[in-house]
A protein has these predicted regions:
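Short C-terminal domain-edge/linker segments immediately following a structured domain
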Residues: 82-85, 175-179, 202-209
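Hydrophobic-ligand binding "helix-grip"
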Residues: 121-165
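Beta-strand/loop substructures that line and gate deep hydrophobic ligand-binding cavities in soluble
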Residues: 150-189
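A conserved amphipathic terminal alpha-helix motif
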Residues: 187-218
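Hydrophobic ligand-binding cavity/cleft-lining segments
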Residues: 2-123
Length: 227
């Protein structure tokens, strides 16, 4: 158990040299050592991954990253292998009933919004995710958290904005999960190699392209006042 969060972690790999890959897997401590508000909500979740995102910027660029992440669709990226994996996943979910309305938040599991302290509950929840079944939990100046649930697991996507050693800032993403019994544990173990070898690299390239293409564009007005 992590002393900072109570969440379990599978063991991160050391960060690689900057620029070696579009998305770089980081040690668990890059998430657990920071005073994120998400720690209050996920003590019974396992920290699955921490990634440095190819999205460098200044102190006020976090809303732009949130807008990008909320509209990203990894199932429509340039990698044919990644697209095929996503298509297979959605078809399996439909066939096996993994993604039905009785499997999500508010039915199979309680939403983590029920755990929000007053300061977060009364603040902005964040954007709606356009492509994936994530529901926003909260949005601050340097954190955005969203949850999803299905028959296999209850998961949290945590996107943050951290200072780097060069005096700038960069995006960071953490994935936390609570597998649903043996089915969930087996599913998470089965997809792990595909996530590391195909899904996350393709997603990193997609983020990098869009981040560079959107440079200089203001974030949506609904995100420009993150508090």
């Amino acid at each position: 158990m992590s002393p900072a969060t109570g969440a379990q972690h599978r063991g991160g790999e050391p960060a690689h040299r900057r620029g070696a890959a579009p998305a770089i897997r980081l040690p668990a401590t890059e998430h657990t050592s920071r005073p994120w508000r998400i720690h209050e909500l996920t003590r019974d979740f396992r920290l699955e991954d921490v990634w440095a995102l190819p999205a460098p910027g200044g102190p006020s660029d976090f809303p732009r990253l949130v807008a990008l992440m909320a509209t990203a669709d990894p199932s429509q990226g340039s990698s044919r292998v990644a697209r095929a994996l996503w298509t297979t996943r959605w078809k399996l979910g439909e066939l096996l009933g993994w993604d039905g309305p009785d499997a999500g938040t508010g039915s199979r599991v309680r939403t983590l919004r029920d755990r929000l302290p007053a300061g977060l509950r009364d603040g902005p929840s964040g954007p709606h995710h356009d492509a994936l079944p994530f529901i926003s939990l909260y949005l601050t100046q340097d954190e955005w958290a969203a949850e999803t649930a299905n028959r296999t697991m209850h998961g949290v996507l945590h996107v943050s904005w951290v200072a780097d050693r060069s005096g700038g800032y960069r995006g960071q993403m953490a994935v936390l999960v609570k597998p649903n019994g043996l089915l969930g544990a087996g599913y998470m173990a089965a997809i792990r190699p595909f996530r590391y070898l195909v899904v996350y690299p393709a997603m990193g390239r997609q983020i990098e392209r869009r981040w560079q293409a959107d440079a200089g564009n203001p974030p949506p007005a609904t995100l420009s006042g993150c508090t």
